[in-house]
């Protein structure tokens, strides 16, 4: 069995975690983490959108309807990129593009059209019908609903983009101080810390390294006996 990718859940919300399913966005060769519909289902399982049994049901249904699953995967990527552009723009102080909001609206409309009232422990809740198995589009619906919730409730000043040169992941800073800088301290933050450490080490080594100079043969001040036998030996600079 192929080893599954462990998705990072550092975005602070489901929709931002979906946006971050492209690794090294700012590099010349970004890495797609959703190459198949099965990977989309695995992302949904790891993110808590579906249970493990529901994920297996989705994969079986995708096997029976491969063309439908492929179309939903394509829609998921389009939605992901729209989410990324919207929230990365807000993090930079730019308003969203109408075309990207239209993508969100389209998926959100379908998601809410499928919602229905479901009994809960205390009253009712809005949920998607699962009696006949989870719909193949369920991961998209959950991400679109999450994006709407963040857009309508989160402080845009708390939206940030990881400053690492090749990363570009976005996240919602939910720390009390609002000073979170990296997508994940154990990832980009740790690498930046290591680079600063090695830079200091190299700088310190260069500053403390002794410098040597060599006298040219026959230079002034060299003893006559050494001029006769050849070049003088290098002497330590004062």
Predicted regions and their residues:
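Extended mid-to-C-terminal alpha-helical interaction segments
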Residues: 155-177, 194-204
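Short helix-coil boundary/hinge micro-motifs
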Residues: 1-160, 168, 208-238
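Basic DNA-binding region of bZIP-type proteins
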Residues: 187-207, 211, 218, 222
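Cysteine-rich micro-motifs
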Residues: 178-189
